[in-house]
């Protein structure tokens, strides 16, 4: 898995109704923009605010609309291992390519507990697994040695890092050099170009919901070592980060930015789940 894999916004009509038509427009917009995969129900997709019914519908409708054109990754993060397994089973039944899992986020586990959690979870999942490092939201970060331990299972195939810590990301890349097949993906788009230049496999970049071709061009330039093109594109990406993502005064500001921009592009409504209204 490599390239630009947007973390899809979940188009909503209300707190428990999926905007299926908006989702279809969004997926077609992304495919036309040349992205390399689709990632649903992550942070940008408001997963933790959505009912299980709505999460399951999002999996089914995304896979139906995509119809095998791109790999689909499904986030199964939950405080309940039973619900994580159930989402993975639905994803497999619908034709998804893999699942993505951040640590359980209520009782923060220590590193031994974290490794044991995944050593229990991964064998019960029907799809390949990407680990998801999101310390700002789940209160714990995967130590590089923990990533290496968990990845002894070959069904753990990649790592998405949203820490925005370049030194940490390089440390994980270093310990995982024994697995050249292990996909290293970065979340923050502001640092995707430099990460790819240093050997990362791609980005799960929210801005690609709005401007997929921009992020694909950035990835291609970084992959090719085209610094002149990157010097032109990186300021545009930073302008998006420092304007669209600053709507409101809270941690969900970037999400509100997406949901303000996508209606302007004619893609979906601006409904944000009640948990993020303010």
PLM regions and their residue ranges:
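Short, flexible micro-motifs
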Residues: 6, 40, 45-48, 78, ...
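Structural recognition of alpha->loop->beta junctions
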Residues: 93-99, 124-127, 149-158, 269-270
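C-terminal alpha-helical cap/extension of soluble enzyme domains
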Residues: 5-9, 33-35, 200, 211-278
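Active-site beta->alpha loop and helix N-cap motifs at the rims of alpha/beta catalytic domains
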Residues: 1-6, 10-141, 277
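Catalytic alpha/beta core domains of metabolic enzymes, predominantly
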Residues: 123-124, 135-241
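A general structural signal for well-ordered alpha-helical segments in protein cores
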Residues: 23, 55, 59, 84, ...
């Amino acid at each position: 898995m490599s390239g630009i894999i947007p973390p899809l916004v979940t188009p909503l009509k209300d707190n428990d109704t999926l905007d299926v038509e908006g989702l279809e427009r969004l997926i077609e917009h992304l495919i036309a923009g040349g992205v390399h995969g689709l990632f649903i129900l992550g942070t940008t997709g408001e997963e933790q605010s959505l009912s299980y019914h709505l999460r399951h519908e999002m999996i089914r409708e995304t896979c139906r609309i995509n119809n095998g054109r791109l790999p689909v990754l499904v986030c199964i993060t939950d405080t309940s291992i039973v619900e994580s397994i159930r989402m993975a089973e639905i994803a497999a039944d619908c034709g998804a390519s893999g699942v993505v899992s951040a640590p359980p986020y209520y009782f923060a586990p220590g590193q031994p507990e974290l490794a044991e959690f995944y050593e229990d979870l991964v064998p019960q999942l029907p799809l390949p697994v990407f680990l998801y490092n999101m310390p700002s939201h789940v209160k714990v970060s995967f130590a590089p040695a923990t990533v290496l331990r968990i990845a002894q299972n070959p069904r753990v195939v990649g790592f998405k890092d949203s820490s925005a810590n370049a030194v940490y990301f390089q440390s994980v890349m270093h310990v995982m050099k024994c697995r050249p097949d292990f996909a290293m993906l970065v979340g923050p788009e502001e640092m995707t170009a430099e990460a790819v230049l240093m050997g990362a496999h791609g980005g799960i970049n929210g801005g690609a919901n709005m401007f997929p071709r921009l992020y694909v061009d950035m990835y291609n330039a970084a992959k090719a070592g085209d610094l002149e093109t990157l010097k032109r594109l990186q300021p545009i990406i930073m302008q998006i980060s420092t304007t669209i993502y600053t709507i409101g005064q809270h941690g969900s500001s970037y999400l509100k930015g997406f949901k303000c921009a996508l209606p302007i592009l004619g893609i979906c409504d601006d409904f944000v789940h009640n948990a993020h209204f303010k």
